[in-house]
Amino acid sequence: MSDDYEHFREVQYLRTWWYVLLALLPAGLIYWGAIQQLYFGEPWGNNPGSDGLMWFLLVVFGILFPLFLLTINMRTTVTGTVNVRFFPFMSKPRRIGRNDIVTYSVVTYSPITDYGGWGIKGTSMHRAYNVYGKRGVRITFANGSTVLIGSQRPEELYTAITAMIRTGTARVVL
């Protein structure tokens, strides 16, 4: 089987209600202020800024900030390596080769108590990549360090890693 064969692909976006609210609440507030000041000509706030400042705020917080928040995603693929990329914070994916894996297993974890929340979390010895949820695959390396890859389909990810390393030396932990 070619290393280019894709055993697994998952793209997870941050789409929880509180996250969408975080993206849209400042945008809505800026839209309201921009309409008041730029369209109706009524200065917005107790100490209003110039129209140029209002245009700047509209572009940055009304358009760019929500677009940025809504494009954050985590892509996980399994080909000849396990690849995890948390866009836009990682320019290149983290690649885990089949020979780097000592053990791996499907786990249920607490993102907040185990890793301090969602995103790229943990320490250099125990890293987690997760978007939401509380399930994933934990991979252990020879030096004892671990990486947890959060997934909405952890059993499929586990099966894909198994298929990837069929000819390798990793040990499966059920």
Label each residue range with its predicted role.
Residues 1-49, 156:
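N-terminal membrane-targeting/pre-transmembrane regions
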Residues 12-23, 62-66, 85-100:
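Generic detector of contiguous secondary-structure segments
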Residues 45-59:
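Hydrophobic alpha-helical transmembrane segments
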Residues 72-87:
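Membrane-helix interface/capping segments
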Residues 78, 96, 149-152:
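A conserved hydrophobic position in a structured secondary element of the catalytic/binding core
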Residues 85-147:
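Non-transmembrane, membrane-adjacent beta-strand/coil modules in membrane-associated proteins
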